[in-house]
Amino acid sequence: MIIIKSKREIDIMREAAKVTGEILRDIEGFIKPGMTTHAIDNFVEERILHYKMKPTFKGYGGFPAAACVSVNDEVVHGIPSRDRVLKEGDIVSVDTGSTYKGYCSDAARTYAVGEISDEARKLIDVTKQSFFEGVKYAMVGYRLHDIGHAVQEYAESNGFGVIREYLGHGIGRDLHEDPQVPNYGDAHTGPHLKEGMVLAIEPMITQGSYGTRVLGNDWTVV
């Protein structure tokens, strides 16, 4: 069931999202070669707590950290580790959220570690723009799959693929609510978008096949 949010609820969620966004901006100047993915997670958690909010991800479904930190071919849900050391040329995705007054936020960003290849830079740039292409359709008057259609069309027109198995979603008191928001699909299909719906739009773009598998830790997707 899609839960429509009131203006008061959306205002609370906006505060949570502002904190998450600020943390993701701050990470850009923090990440460097030689750093562990655990250090990134520690930075994220300390910042969330500084704002008197709760790390949305920590403990969710048993996830052990405040942030998913996924490196290179890891698509999502990377578990931070003291043993995983970033090196020059890596790209790293940090996915996190802050909970405020019982309402969740959820956002991700991908970063370059030092100097990266032109191909890796293009992947980051196309993924970012595909998000904004989808957001153009997150408005009353459009339908849900217009969002995914725009993401897919932009990514594929630039020579990249779109992950099928992992999706965006509604968000509110629960991190994952209805509806699921795929990053692909046919335009003019799916539920009509209504005022008060809150969506996490999460393009996952790949240089290779869109097929995925889960590693032995039961979390990390490659």
Residue ranges of model-derived segments:
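Active-site neighborhoods and metal-handling regions in enzymes and metal-associated proteins
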Residues: 1-222
